[in-house]
Amino acid sequence: MAAGLRLGPLLRYVDGSAGGAADTPAGATATVWVEADRPCTARVRCADGAEGSARTFQIAGHHYAVIPVTGLTPGAATPYEVLLDDHGVWPLPGSPFPPSTIRVPETGDGSALRVAFGSCRWAAKPGNGRLARGGPDALDTLATTLAADPEAERPDVLLLLGDQVYADETSPAVRRRLAARRDPRDPPGSEVADYEEYSWLYDESWGDPEVRWLLSTVPSSMIFDDHDVIDDWNTSASWLAEMRATPWWRERILSGLMSYWVYQHLGNLSPAELAADPLYAEVCAAPDGTEALRRFASEADADPARTRWSNRRDFGRTRLVTIDTRAARVLDEDGRSMLDPDEARWVREQVLDAPGSYDHLLVATSLPWLLPPLIHDAEAWSAALCRGGRGRRWAWFGEDLRRRSDLEHWAAFPASFDWLSGLLTEAAGRADAPATVCVLSGDVHHAYVAEPVGDEGTGARVLQLTCSPLHNAIPAVVRLGFRFAWSRAGRRLGRALARHGRVPRRSFGWHRTGGPWFGNQLMTLTLRGRAATLRLNQARAVRGGGGRLERTEERRLA
């Protein structure tokens, strides 16, 4: 029986600068991720002659391949097909969608780079439970728009900044599968428990026909946030100790890290990085790579400093540094840090490497750097209480508040907030500074633009660009809370909390220059030379079902 395609293809890494391994032919490169239903050789064959192949590797009874494609032409778009053991499996027979293409952006002077980003996509359709009023899915709507006009302007890369799946908030369809497999009264109940159940989340998210086609033709880069594992993942040392004391947590965290490595992380790597990765080589060489990957996940959980999920991409004269703000945390209250020392050193090196070689610096972090001022001050206040600054009873209150209110962004790690602020200021203030330094984030279920006050003298414009969710719902009371958090009254309340916690005064202030916008939405940066334009599109429901993308905001940044 011929091998079949279970999931994918996903077009992941696309590079117009011949970023393949040293022994690959010249030309642009790409990687395509697939899951097959049995061991096989997966091949990508392009209409212009570019191609690549890879043997599947096995994890927990599943069969995957990451196919390096070489010989692509920068500036060109070529349709491609996927074959398993030389049997065509993509495009699907009778597909209503246009052919999937690999489009390699040009990186020369005058060429534009379009970077779209967002986060927090609950994959269930709007009619399911709590999302009955959530509205159309922004990725579904983008797919419908592009499929209707294949020549329309499209992103050169799609950044998915966390909560690609919700391991702790499963849909009715997934809950039915869980109940058929095990007793839902046993922990973790309706949450996923192991690798197999994680695979169902990705099936649901990426198997959606519109999103499946979109991800087959628009390159993507991804980083996790908390719901990819569990709400409030690594919020504090006491939280982690409590989780490790449960009978189900170890399998959950190992399966979460294993599935992230397979489904998301591998596609962030270039063909050269894949070829040099010892774990990838070990997994591919083994008849069954499960134990090797499980050992890696166990080591990463025990000592996060041994693993790096952060990554860097250079798109011509645009640099993207994506920071892991979940797994690399140092949680000891006396030394809390968003990043361990080695991770922080690596991020700094990537940001400051080769000064003058880029016109735009994009720092992607699932958690916003600049928050509404009230929330920032509340997080700094809570962190001060937890350190014992107001005594033991206030420390208990601070920890309880931190967990109940999700007070775990950069502001909840004051030393790390100051470190990141200093790094961005240094990058923006050099004589050979880029035109813009943009922090791209999600998580907070609304979109906004914020800018530091008093940075007009720097060489670069520094901005916090936040866009969330792609598909989720936010109660009206929470919307009101976010609006209040940006208000003057909210600022005054935040300062009062900071004084109570004896929090040092902030070294700089910031103001909101756009938003807040609420809804299912996607931000896009268009970068051309030293010019930059921002656009926000929101998914709006249309009569008769479905949705359309509506341009809510467009502005020039540089």
What are the roles of these predicted feature ranges?
Residues M1-A558:
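Metal-dependent phosphoester/phosphodiester hydrolase catalytic core
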